[in-house]
């Protein structure tokens, strides 16, 4: 398993898989992994040739800075879990890698942005959609696997 911290290095590492027309799967996470994440990796392995799991605690989806500060980051544990699960690549970028400059863009999510969890966490889904787009741009996956707790995000 290869741990990668930079988008350019990730693209280089995935180039041979692309040239061989292998299917690439992305399992995006914020870390603090558990058996549910491992099950997503296993499902990705069934349907793709290469599995990339990202670990990135995205500051733009936290409305309260204290929540961001308190978010658990057991990186050694997470890496061991992914290695044991047989993940091919772990993409662990820094905040400056994903957000090199301040950004001010908006994705129109329609009314879904303000329903359910969005009603109580203003701006949360903008942050989620921004990082998912950035991860998709970095990995360019054929498949992506999200957990059940991300139901509203999938909508």
Located regions from the model:
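Nucleotidyltransferase catalytic core that binds NTPs
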Residues: 2-155
């Amino acid at each position: 398993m290869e741990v990668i911290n930079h988008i350019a290095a990730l693209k280089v590492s995935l180039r041979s898989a692309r040239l061989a027309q292998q299917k690439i799967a992305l399992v995006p996470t914020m870390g603090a992994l558990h058996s549910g994440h491992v099950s997503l990796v296993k499902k990705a392995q069934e349907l793709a040739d290469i599995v990339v799991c990202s670990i990135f605690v995205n500051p733009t989806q936290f409305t309260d800075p204290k929540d961001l500060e308190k978010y658990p980051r057991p990186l050694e544990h997470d890496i061991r879990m992914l290695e044991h699960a047989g993940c091919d690549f772990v993409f662990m970028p820094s905040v400056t890698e994903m957000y090199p400059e301040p950004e001010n863009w908006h994705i129109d999510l329609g009314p879904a942005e303000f329903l359910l969890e969005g009603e109580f966490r203003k701006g949360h889904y903008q942050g989620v959609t921004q990082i998912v787009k950035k991860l998709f741009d970095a990995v360019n996956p054929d498949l992506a696997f999200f957990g059940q707790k991300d139901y509203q995000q999938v909508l």
